């Protein structure tokens, strides 16, 4: 999700999102389920959210929707949910680029066109968004947002006029787009899920009684009492309609799969399974690898809440050094990684975490975290640990150094903002104030997820597809 430099587009950091959809064939109201599903995906985006619903027994094409800035529980009060009654619906959580936190850019997007209505929610990023947008504008398209999700929605609506079904229109549209996308789409009588052929972004299927569910992560299924059925396969389009059956077809492409490894390192919730791999177990394996690769004499292994905790436990189990909690987390402060400005990130670190002095005083600490992007968080935490009496702080990072930008929707920005692109490991160690620093060796990264093919381009620049030559900040958002 990148901004353009033109007028309404803004320069800044990229975003990650969560999508959710449900179709209850018994006619039950789904808006409460969407609310709880989005709440379970809140870690994937905290700046805006939205819900769009329809009633398959009502007037064809009538969609009710509401979007707002803030957390799910802030935007959707009970009275608002009561206005969004329907037995089919989709939802979205988002965090945005600097300056683009607007309701207009919140999702789901709802289009009314010749064939009826279409609502769409998107997680990911298109690498040819500017090219497609220019082509569409040259043929009369008028866009109302600065997000590339609108390009997808507009493309489907255009192709639908010449297609027998929405699915056919989707197939025609995805032939033209390049990038990462997990989509949930609601047409008047169908719920549709789409996953890009590389499998870069996650999407799974669940079932609760006579309702079908789509979600970015399995934790959202659990939150509404749905059973996990399976992941949507890379390149697959799944459809749920009044027959109650799951219909599947695949894009006619054959590409090497490249699942985003950062889902397992940081983004996904600990209790989720993605592509049949437990996020928790993947992080445990990562921590164990760090212990084997970078052993150190220490008294306590601690993780940075939340995404560093499981890796710290893995380090502890492998090394035999006791595991402990060094920090208390204020759960009412959002992730530092997804704050839109550097100043907000720095202040957020100190408000979000406080040191348990009685635990760390006089101890040699191994501090495990998921990544170092700018160095903001880890430097502050080391200072806090030392002020609380820690005698040594040894940092272990469960990902390799970030050296290259991500073009597919993960908040890994341009090279100038990546500390590892201009500093050696020793220079970073000195800058953050650690006694030692060890990153996950890139050759060991695969061990976290077994034989699952992964994208690790932000570490080695081996992108799974051709990416733009211009700076990433010149791309559209999603």
Question: For the regions a protein language model found, what residue spans apply to each?
Answer:
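Short, glycine/charge-rich flexible loops or terminal/linker lids adjacent to PRPP-binding catalytic cores
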Residues: 320-365, 376-379, 403-409, 413
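Extended, hydrophobic alpha-helical segments in both membrane/secreted and soluble proteins
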Residues: 301, 308-315, 319, 323, ...
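Mobile, glycine- and charge-enriched loop segments
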Residues: 354-368, 372-373, 397, 472-478
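Conserved short alpha-helical segments that host acidic/polar catalytic motifs at enzyme active sites
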Residues: 1-234, 239-298, 304, 392
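Flexible loop/turn segments at secondary-structure boundaries
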Residues: 97-98, 128, 200-201, 221-222, ...
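PRPP-dependent phosphoribosyltransferase catalytic core
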Residues: 174, 189, 225-231, 383-478
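A conserved beta-strand->alpha-helix junction
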Residues: 76, 145, 150-153, 323-334, ...
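Secondary-structure transition/capping motifs at alpha-helix termini
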Residues: 141, 162-163, 295-299, 317-324, ...
């Amino acid at each position: 999700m990148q901004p353009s430099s033109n007028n309404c587009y803004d320069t800044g950091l990229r975003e990650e999102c969560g999508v959710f959809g449900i179709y209850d064939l018994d006619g039950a109201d789904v808006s409460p389920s969407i609310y709880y599903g989005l709440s379970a995906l809140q870690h994937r985006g905290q700046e805006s959210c939205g819900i769009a619903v329809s009633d398959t027994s009502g007037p064809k094409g009538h969609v009710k929707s509401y979007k707002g800035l803030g957390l799910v529980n802030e935007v959707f009060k009970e009275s608002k949910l009561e206005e969004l009654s329907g037995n089919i619906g989709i939802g979205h959580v988002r965090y945005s680029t600097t300056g683009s936190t607007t309701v207009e850019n919140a999702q789901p997007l709802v289009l009314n066109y010749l064939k009826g209505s279409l609502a769409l929610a998107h997680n990911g990023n298109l690498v040819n968004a500017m090219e497609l947008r220019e082509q569409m504008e040259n043929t009369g398209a008028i866009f109302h947002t600065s997000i590339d999700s609108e390009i997808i929605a507009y493309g489907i609506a255009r192709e639908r006029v010449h297609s027998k079904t929405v699915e056919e229109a989707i197939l025609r549209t995805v032939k033209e787009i390049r990038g990462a996308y997990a989509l949930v789409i609601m047409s008047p009588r169908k719920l549709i899920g789409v996953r890009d052929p590389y499998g870069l972004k996650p999407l799974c299927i669940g079932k609760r009684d006579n309702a079908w569910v789509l979600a970015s992560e399995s934790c959202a299924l659990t939150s509404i009492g749905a059973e996990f059925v399976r992941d949507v396969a890379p390149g697959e389009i799944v459809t749920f309609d009044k027959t109650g059956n799951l219909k599947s077809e695949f894009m006619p492409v054959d590409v090497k799969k490249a699942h985003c490894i950062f889902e397992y390192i940081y983004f996904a919730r600990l209790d989720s399974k993605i592509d049949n791999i437990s996020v928790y177990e993947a992080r445990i394996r990562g921590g164990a690898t760090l212990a084997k690769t970078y052993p150190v004499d220490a008294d306590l292994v601690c993780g940075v809440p939340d995404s560093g905790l499981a890796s710290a436990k893995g380090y502890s189990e492998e090394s035999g050094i006791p595991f402990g909690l060094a920090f208390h987390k204020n759960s009412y402060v959002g992730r530092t990684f997804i704050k839109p400005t550097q100043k907000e990130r720095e202040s957020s670190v100190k408000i979000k975490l406080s040191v348990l002095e009685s635990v760390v005083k006089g101890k040699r600490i191994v501090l495990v975290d998921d990544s170092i992007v700018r160095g903001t968080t880890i430097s502050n935490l080391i200072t806090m640990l030392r002020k609380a009496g820690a005698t040594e702080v040894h940092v272990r990072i469960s990902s390799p150094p970030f050296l290259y930008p991500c073009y597919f929707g993960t908040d890994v920005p341009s090279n100038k903002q990546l500390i590892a692109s201009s500093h050696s490991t020793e220079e970073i160690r000195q800058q953050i104030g650690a006694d030692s620093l060890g990153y996950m060796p890139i050759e060991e990264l695969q061990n976290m997820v077994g034989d699952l093919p992964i994208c690790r381009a932000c570490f080695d620049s081996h992108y799974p597809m051709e990416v733009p030559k211009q700076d990433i900040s010149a791309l559209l958002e999603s």
